Amino acid sequence: MKVIFTQDVRGKGNRGQVKEVPDGYAENFLIRKGLAKAATPQAMSALRGQQRLEEKKEAEKKTEAEAMKAKIEDDKTVVQIQSKAGEDSRLFGSIPSKQIAQALDKQYQIKVDKRKIDLKQPIRSLGFTNVTVNLFPGIDARIRVHVIEQK
């Protein structure tokens, strides 16, 4: 029996996938528990429509990410962060990705999730640092972060 998986089933199939499974397994387990539904012509056309909608949303997210990348990588976009520092330009504390995301939002009204900022280690010194932001799979932007001494 052909079924359309409505949820991920370990070892059998992923959500949205159409697969051939034994009749008893499909009727007694998958369909009863709501993990899959029978692959009728109506269900197949609904699945195709849903996949087209998801592809459209994905394309919109990609164009939005590309526009954000252009805005971020503009030469004038330099995120300035003030922090207390010692004699040898070393900071008291550090600048984590959360602080960079907040400064980017405050200075340029660009909202970026702190988990998308690829910062191997927090910034611990004054000056310029290039930081990579993963906006979308395959679309990365570089932010210039300028840490200046707070007086």
Curated annotation (Swiss-Prot):
UniProt-recorded Gene Ontology molecular function terms: rRNA binding; structural constituent of ribosome
Keyword rRNA-binding part of the UniProt annotation: yes
Record GO cellular component, one term: ribosome
Signal peptide feature range: none
GO biological process: translation
Pfam families: Ribosomal_L9_C, Ribosomal_L9_N
Keyword terms of this UniProt record: Ribonucleoprotein, Ribosomal protein, RNA-binding, rRNA-binding
Gene3D superfamilies reported for this sequence: Ribosomal protein L9, C-terminal domain, Ribosomal protein L9, N-terminal domain
DNA-binding recorded as keyword: no
Task of the protein: Binds to the 23S rRNA.
Family to which the UniProt record says this protein belongs: Belongs to the bacterial ribosomal protein bL9 family.
NCBIfam families: L9
Protein name per Swiss-Prot or TrEMBL: Large ribosomal subunit protein bL9
